[in-house]
Amino acid sequence: METLFNGSLTVGGRDQESTGFAWWSGNARLINLSGKLLGAHVAHAGLIVFWAGAMNLFEVAHFVPEKPMYEQGLILLPHIASLGYGVGPGGEIIDTFPYFVSGVLHLISSAVLGFGGIYHALIGPETLEESFPFFGYIWKDKNKMTTILGIHLILLGFGAWLLVWKAMYFGGVYDTWAAGGGDVRIISNPTTNPGVIFGYLLKSPFGGDGWICSVDNMEDLIGGHIWIGTLEIFGGIWHILTKPWGWARRAFVWSGEAYLSYSLAAISAMGFIACCMSWFNNTAYPSEFYGPTGPEASQAQAFTFLVRDQRLGANVASAQGPTGLGKYLMRSPTGEIIFGGETMRFWDFRGPWLEPLRGPNGLDLNKLKNDIQPWQERRSAEYMTHAPLGSLNSVGGVATEINSINYVSPRSWLATSHFCLGFFFFVGHLWHAGRARAAAAGFEKGIDRDTEPVLSMKPID
């Protein structure tokens, strides 16, 4: 029971005594009012979609086609561009109208959701069980809860399949690995081999292994969505048709707050994964839109100066740096030829502008001398000066390169925000899980405050 200074305060006809929660506990007052809780959820969805639409249009209004997206602080347009809308060869933005349409569609959707949220919060029935039993529920009804879980899984699976259909049949998606510097293409042969797809899940998360963040081709990425979309749809059907088994009934706490805690744990995990994915991966998050990764900017610096000095007559194969190690090229711990100097720590980086210059034993000296294309030089010079860790005059986190510009990479925004959100959602999971377990065990949440000294003191003012 929450303790209010003003215990008589009533909001919306629901006071602390009747609900067990103070006014600032918000939707907790609606735990047993399925109709009102539906209104809160729909209105919340409307707010989310409104932000997406409004921010989308804000980015369109401020977008300058002559500058890369990542120099303009954009976080939504890069996502739409990655889906292949309005993009030409090399990641050039050739049409902003699809971005405008996306913003307008989200705004219209938010209006519909907002109306539905207000209707159910203010006008609709307080509970749904009597009038609309299909949409009604009781938190302890285990069969109903797993049915709702199943419906959610089917919707998530359908969402995963939407990306598959877009990539395979409706215009394709942007592939940063397409020949010549990236392009929009149809993914006609996605990977369905379970050994490949689930191999990502079994990889180490450390170093060059990178767990699922190491996906480096669109075939595997779209194939992964085929698998997860299919599994979620079949899992949803399973949960709708079956009742929880005995071990599941005993293992879980079956209450509204428990389900909230499970959801917070899941979204926390997704936040941490999104953090790593947006920071390290340059296939799902193409560098043309999001800027280079940290290792990419560092490798680009080494490549740019190798190109420059090779033109000036340097023997890049044998030149030594001040430490006696290779100035331009050296050997990795496992024998591959890699870039030398400070960037050696990022030797397992892979990027579409660099991979054509590799051979079976790492970087190919003959290719470095004869096959470097102008687009590779331009792109590495651009990435060198746009490190995501960069502050003023910084490349790859090393504050020595005077050609850098002062900007904050979308990768920095996305990785930092998702890490922070993931952390706080995890704390929320612990909080609500503890409360739910305490309630299920039969003891009062919180502490007895009857003897707390502050309750007998005069108000400060």
From Swiss-Prot:
Annotated gene: psbC
Main function: One of the components of the core complex of photosystem II (PSII). It binds chlorophyll and helps catalyze the primary light-induced photochemical processes of PSII. PSII is a light-driven water:plastoquinone oxidoreductase, using light energy to abstract electrons from H(2)O, generating O(2) and a proton gradient subsequently used for ATP formation.
Residues noted as binding [CaMn4O5] cluster in the record, renumbered to the chain: E355
Residues of the propeptide: 1-2
Keywords (A to Z) from UniProt: Acetylation, Chlorophyll, Chloroplast, Chromophore, Manganese, Membrane, Metal-binding, Phosphoprotein, Photosynthesis, Photosystem II, Plastid, Thylakoid, Transmembrane, Transmembrane helix
Organism annotation: Oltmannsiellopsis viridis (Marine flagellate)
Protein name, as recorded: Photosystem II CP43 reaction center protein
GO molecular function, one term: electron transporter, transferring electrons within the cyclic electron transport pathway of photosynthesis activity
Transmembrane segments: 57-81, 122-143, 166-188, 243-263, 279-300, 435-459
Record-listed N-acetylthreonine modification sites: T3
Membrane topology of the entry: Multi-pass membrane protein
